[in-house]
Amino acid sequence: ERVRLGVCIGEFHNKLMDRMLEDARVSAEAMGATIDKVVWVPGTYEAPLVVENMLQDPTLDACVVLGYIEKGSTLHGQEMGATFSIIAKQLELEYGKPVGMGIIGPGATAEQAEMRVAYAGNAVRASVRMAR
């Protein structure tokens, strides 16, 4: 039986995110999984509500979050990343479904982000393995 995935993806860095989504699709197909739902959100801060909705969806087996929290001049990105990680883990445990973390950063430069597009596939593979 195929694992059915939902993908929550940040739209702020849309060219990079398009490439990550494609990597996620290729990885899902290679694992015998399908991406049945994709929801674009403004950024990581907005992702938890979508993740919770996906985990509540009985047609989905797991959720994958894709994003990029870039290096900034303040600690805002680090705070967002840490907060989201905690919330995602709480939701995963509450609903008993995996949440794959394909978020680059926080604190990554544009060059580092380009080199980490494959984080999307890693998140898909981890989610599929945990859902099985």
Question: What are the roles of these predicted feature ranges?
Answer:
Residues 38, 61-66, 98-104:
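Short beta-strand segments at enzyme active-site cores
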Residues 36-46, 105:
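Short beta->alpha junction loops
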Residues 1-40:
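Glycine-rich phosphate/diphosphate-binding loop of Rossmann-like nucleotide-binding domains
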Residues 46-87:
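Glycine-rich phosphate-binding loop
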